[in-house]
From Swiss-Prot:
It is found in: Cell membrane. This is Uncharacterized protein PA1977. It holds the Pfam family EamA. Keywords: Cell membrane, Membrane, Repeat, Transmembrane, Transmembrane helix. Residues 15-136, 155-276 form the EamA domain. The chain crosses the membrane at residues 7-28, 32-54, 67-86, 91-113, 120-139, 144-163, 170-192, 202-224, 231-253, 263-280. It is a multi-pass membrane protein. The lineage of its organism: Bacteria, Pseudomonadati, Pseudomonadota, Gammaproteobacteria, Pseudomonadales.
Amino acid sequence: MPDRRTLLLTVLAMLAFAGNSLLCRAALKDTAIDAVSFTALRLFSGALMLAVLLHLRRRPATPARGGWRGAAALFVYAAAFSYAYVQLDAGTGALLLFGAVQVTLLLAGLLRGERLGGQALLGFLLALGGLLFLLLPGASAPPLGGALLMLLSGLAWGLYTLLGRGGGDPLAVSAGNFLRALAFAALLLLAFHGQLRLDGAGLAYALLSGALASGLGYAVWYSALPGLTAIQGASVQLSVPVLAALCGALLLGEPLAPRLPPATLAVLGGIALILAPRLGRAAREGA
């Protein structure tokens, strides 16, 4: 059982992850900021926050690390995420993102030779079916363009996660990747310089998304991870789409699409089935 400090850090990290969806959707729905400006400001403030946190740590100075492949994946994630939330509600976007990330990680495992048992295969098909159900044509389906962009964002984040495994100090790697991603953001700003829009509220949302929900949120999550098993770390992330949907309804006044609750149950239930055998093995080994 995680200690109280780990539990608190975990709750704060999940709120930060859900907060990214809420801040991005609120900015692009209710303010004048455009998706390109939001992306660039989010990456800039995230890089700044991570650099500050890296500097303040009580250990020998660690330079920012990471690499260009990780930075490219991070940029694609952030840009597609912003463009998707021009059209999607917070809960729908978070579910598509989360589902795409988990499917990407699972497929990567299969390509490495990992095998799925019967229960895990059922879970994979259930989660995939939930995503497809959400995307089926109909009055309550999310806009296809926004949905595809969010799936691309999830794919990119899954690749970013895979590239970061075994890369050393996660905070230093994240700081380096955010810093490098600014080069891609600058190119995007140049390409769309005549279409950029900004106001005070949009600026504030973008800076909060980058500095708090992204930079500080990732740092809090990295601090919580040593106190969690791998299965616990994967399982608690099941809460993010639910938190985003509930907070979107409460704070942004977004209606819950009729397909969202059953799709959420299918996706999260399927992922829980995938994790359950590993959780059982971990519990037996720790007994």
